[in-house]
Amino acid sequence: MARILAATHHCIARHGAQTTIAHVAADLGVSRATVYRYFPSTAELLRTASAEGIRRFLRAIADRLRAVDDLAEAVIEGVVYTVTQVPHEPYLRLVLDEPSHTLLRAVTSDTAREIGTNVLLEKTSINWTEMALTSDTFDELVEWALRAVQSFLSDPGDPPRGPDELREFLRRWLAPAIRAWADAPAPRSLG
């Protein structure tokens, strides 16, 4: 199976979302039936291969946010990094270019929210003990950030904003709302 996935990565680099089991089989020098024994469909093969690329992306975003200690900046940087990296990440493009667009619809799924929550809670330097947040409102913040990603991916604007312009746009309109919410005196503990 490792050889099949390695060949799939090679084919994705060449063919992108147009990669088929026939491409992978030809790259390996085996029959399509051999590949089908391990993966029942092209979609399943591409989904499995893309999971590895997505894990790499998540490690990269975690590295980028590791030193961030401001909640608004962490959300903004996460949105900007995701929006600007999708065009350069073949595996993210692969799942976004998938014809049914299930990823765009699933951007606020439980799994996506769990990943976003984990990145903010575990991968940043934010001092959470100084912020008393409820899990419900924190979940809403993560959902909002994911919806912002979804929006900028589906319609980047005309002309599209570069990373610095997008960062400033979000600092102007999103950061004040996050800071007002995070600084509100009401008791808000995670848990």
What is each PLM-predicted segment?
Residues 3, 23, 52, 56, ...:
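Amphipathic alpha-helical interaction segments
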Residues 103-132, 136-143:
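Amphipathic alpha-helical packing segments from all-alpha helical-bundle domains
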Residues 18, 43-44, 73, 94, ...:
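Residue-level preference for short helical/loop micro-motifs built around acidic side chains
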Residues 4-12, 57, 61, 82:
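Short hydrophobic clusters on alpha-helical segments that form packing/core surfaces
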Residues 84-88, 142-162, 174-184:
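Amphipathic C-terminal alpha-helical segment
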Residues 3, 7, 11-44, 48:
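Helix-turn-helix
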Residues 48, 61-88:
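Hydrophobic alpha-helical connector segments
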